[in-house]
Regions:
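Conserved catalytic core of nucleotide-sugar-dependent glycosyltransferases
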Residues: 30-109
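Short, solvent-exposed loop/turn segments at secondary-structure junctions
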Residues: 23-27, 31-33, 48-50, 128-130, ...
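Conserved glycosyltransferase catalytic-site signature
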Residues: 1-3, 23, 116-121
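GT-A fold catalytic core of metal-dependent nucleotide-sugar glycosyltransferases
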Residues: 4-43
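A glycosyltransferase accessory/donor-loop signature
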Residues: 97-168
Length: 168
């Protein structure tokens, strides 16, 4: 599924790609225009969210940096991983060309050479560290547009909820 997120840019023609994880659910109306501001597209970016103590995330950041020909990431690092993420199609295509140029391999082989990678970190590092967010036509937004319960600290107190509606 991670490689497919890159491949959809080659197959599609829309300017903006919106990824909604399969385990998320919309429970109220969502206005897609809220992801655009004067032509710039929202990029989920949580500043300094990935610390050197986050063992699962470090390889994702390192692989993204290496893949893009960048210096090793500094920590804390921004986090670009979320359940509802928007990308610009033209930048995905530019990213894939960049990866092929840096690696000398096709983009699938280059990205998948490491089993553990995050497509969101790769795209985030590309638009921020290679293109520059403003030049890339993105505006950073740390708001989570849907609630996530990936980690135990996210789910704290859920055992006391009386109904699903209280989660919202």
């Amino acid at each position: 599924q991670q490689l497919r997120k890159f491949a959809v840019a080659k197959a599609g023609s829309e300017d903006v790609i919106l990824f909604a994880d399969s385990d998320m659910l919309f429970v109220r109306p969502f206005d897609l225009t809220s992801l655009s501001d004067d032509g710039a597209i929202r990029l989920y970016r949580k500043p300094d969210a990935i610390t050197a103590e986050m063992a699962r995330h470090i390889p994702w950041c390192t692989h993204a940096s290496t893949l893009l020909g960048l210096d090793a990431p500094a920590f804390p690092s921004p986090d670009y991983i979320n359940n509802l993420v928007s990308w610009r199609r033209d930048h995905v295509l530019a990213l894939l060309d960049h990866v092929e140029s840096v690696s000398g391999r096709d983009w699938v082989s280059a990205i998948a050479r490491e089993r553990q990678f995050s497509e969101y970190m790769i795209y985030g590092y590309f638009v921020e560290r290679v293109l520059g967010l403003e030049a890339a036509g993105h505006w950073p937004d740390a708001r989570e547009l849907c609630k996530v319960y990936w980690f135990s600290e996210d789910a704290a107190g859920m055992d006391r909820l009386a109904s699903f509606e209280e989660v919202l």
